[in-house]
Regions:
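Short flexible/disordered coil segments
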Residues: 5-6, 73, 121, 179-189
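Active-site metal-binding core of divalent-cation-utilizing nuclease and nuclease-like domains
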Residues: 110-150, 158
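Nuclease-adjacent, charged terminal/linker segments that flank catalytic cores
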Residues: 1-104, 111
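Catalytic cores of nucleic-acid endonucleases
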Residues: 154-189
Length: 189
């Protein structure tokens, strides 16, 4: 069985960059250089899904990888048994979240919401919604006539499992979810 990373990308808050696990851990030299930087607090690694701190950890075969800290709260990447395809789709999602187009769409939605009567408490990418140990950070959050609404923007492939997970989470919380999907084939899923 081949080695499969469950966390393929991490966000370095020091540099503002997304780090690709397969790139930063491609050679022993690169791997241990990142580990050195981590232990000297030269990088601050965070999970792109849950925004919790990550460690640089080693396996019993000395393969370095990103790992949630001990006693970390719920994270979809940590708690869910994802296939290799689903893991890659999520990595694409996190890469896409940082694209200029994604940021433009979030800000454009917020701008349009500001002009609508009955809409308030508009937040772009900075509000967490909690359900027990689980939390989600929608791209755009607002209240419309005292109803909570969230917008999730997706510009790359996404598994139905991920869509249903988000749907179920927000439904449990009584929050209305609006997906903005790019070139999504409903019938092909």
């Amino acid at each position: 069985m081949s080695f499969q990373r469950s966390i393929k990308v991490a966000f370095d808050k020091t540099s503002g960059e997304i780090l690709e696990a397969d790139d930063v851990f491609d050679t022993a030299k690169n791997s241990f250089e990142l580990r050195r930087q981590y232990h000297r607090d030269e990088v601050e690694l965070y999970c792109c899904e849950c925004d919790q701190k990550l460690n640089v950890s080693g396996s019993k075969y000395d393969r370095l990888h990103f790992k949630h800290q001990p006693n970390a709260a719920f994270c979809y990447l940590k708690e869910t048994d994802l296939s290799q395809e689903e893991t890659e789709q999520l990595a694409q999602l996190y890469r896409g979240k940082e694209s200029a187009r994604h940021k433009t769409l979030k800000n454009k939605i917020a701008e349009k919401l500001y002009n609508l009567d009955g809409v308030d408490s508009i937040c772009v990418d900075d509000t967490f919604i909690y359900d027990g140990n689980e939390k989600r950070r929608p791209d755009v959050y607002c209240k419309y006539l005292d109803k909570e609404l969230v917008f999730e923007i997706q510009l790359s492939d996404l598994s139905l499992r991920y869509i249903y997970d988000r749907h179920d989470f927000y439904k449990r919380k009584g929050v209305f979810l609006i997906w903005i999907l790019d070139d999504f084939d409903v019938h092909g899923q």
